[in-house]
Swiss-Prot record:
<dbReference type="InterPro" id="IPR008228">
    <property type="entry name" value="UCP006173"/>
</dbReference>
<dbReference type="InterPro" id="IPR005358">
    <property type="entry name" value="Puta_zinc/iron-chelating_dom"/>
</dbReference>
<dbReference type="Pfam" id="PF03692">
    <property type="entry name" value="CxxCxxCC"/>
</dbReference>
<protein>
    <recommendedName>
        <fullName>UPF0260 protein Sfri_1740</fullName>
    </recommendedName>
</protein>
<comment type="similarity">
    <text>Belongs to the UPF0260 family.</text>
</comment>
Length: 148
């Protein structure tokens, strides 16, 4: 079994490999979001980045994603506090606010199947952003789901 480094190592002290392994690969950060102009409320949509694979929930061009999507966000220990749009289920966000990893997290289960079974990932729930005319028509609530 893997050493549970996330319990003993502060986020800012993690190696790049440790940091990257915290990502559960749910794909929620790849969803387009809308901010209401009047209320500043954030809404998730099921319109995903055109690079997201709807089945694996992974980026088709991850190593070179900034070439294809310059506005893609790189989540780092330095900017995690500012990324308030990350869902509550996100391991980076959970650890930043002092929560542990949920029982379905791949670092605890050894694979992504428990995450998919818990309904946490975007698997099978998205549409390619290139096929969407109005993001407002794609607002969904399920990305906010956080299951222990």
């Amino acid at each position: 079994m893997m050493t549970q480094f996330w319990i003993t190592t502060p986020l800012e002290k993690m190696t790049p490999e440790q940091w990257e392994s915290l990502c559960d690969g749910c794909g929620k950060c790849c969803l387009n979001k809308i901010i209401d102009d009047e209320t500043d409320e954030l809404y998730y949509t099921n319109a995903a980045c055109h690079l997201l694979d709807n089945d694996t929930c992974g980026c088709r061009r991850y190593p070179n994603r900034f070439t294809y999507v310059p506005e893609c966000t790189s989540i780092t220990p330095e900017n995690i506090a500012e990324l308030t749009w990350l869902p509550d289920s996100c391991a980076y966000r959970r650890l930043h606010v002092g929560k542990g990893l949920p029982s379905w997290h791949p670092l605890l289960t050894g694979n992504k199947e428990a995450m998919h079974a818990a309904g946490i990932s975007v698997q099978g729930k998205t549409v390619n952003e290139m096929k969407v005319k109005y993001l407002e028509d794609c607002i969904v609530l399920w990305p906010m789901l956080d299951v222990e």
